[in-house]
Amino acid sequence: EGAKDADGIITSWGIRIDQQVIAGLEKFAVVGVGSVGVDMVDVDAATEAGIVVTNTPDIFIEEVADHTLMLLLACARRVKLMDKMAGRGDWYKGRPVLNEIPRLWGQTLGLISFGNVATAVARRAKPFGMHIIAYDPFVTELKMTAEGVEPVTLDELLERSDYLSIHP
């Protein structure tokens, strides 16, 4: 109702632009979505009404890559277990657990898909001394090798990876 006379709108999470909303827009020309996906917009209804739907394909690449590496480190260093031990006052019992944790240096990170996020993850993992392998049938071997990433088959990736990250 409030956007009925607007020329366009920028939307993001939680605001659904469905066929009913689109039908009530009189002079709307564009819906800009502040995310990679446009699943919160009924694109077919918008197209039929002559409304252009755009997205933001490069948003959050760096943030998702940071978060991915944070989760990898949390798993590798058993952060959840160590935090629970510290919370119980058993922090001093953590040394044997730490002795069982392998270094990331020399470990293999397998990436399924090698788009923008996976490329950013690979760049972050390299300084930790990780060997990076990737499988993506839609990306050239040249692009992967230019990033210092070894292209492999999916079966080989699953067999060789110590850690696995998927970024479709």
Where are each of the predicted segments found?
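Short gly/ser/thr-rich secondary-structure transition/capping motifs
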Residues: E1, T11-G14, R88-P96, T145-P151
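An N-terminal-biased, well-structured beta-alpha scaffold segment characteristic
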Residues: E1-T54
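Short beta->alpha connector loops at strand-helix junctions that form conserved
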Residues: G34-S35, G50-E62, D136, L154-D155
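Mobile beta-alpha loop/short-helix "lid" or hinge segments that flank ligand
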Residues: M40-A45, K80-K93, M130-I133, F138-T140
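Phosphate-binding beta-alpha-beta segment of Rossmann-like dinucleotide-binding domains, i.e.
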Residues: A49, P57-T108, A120-R123
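Residue-level detector of anion-binding/catalytic polar loops
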Residues: V52, A74, R78, H131, ...
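Rossmann-like dinucleotide/phosphate-binding beta-alpha-beta segment
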Residues: V97-P168
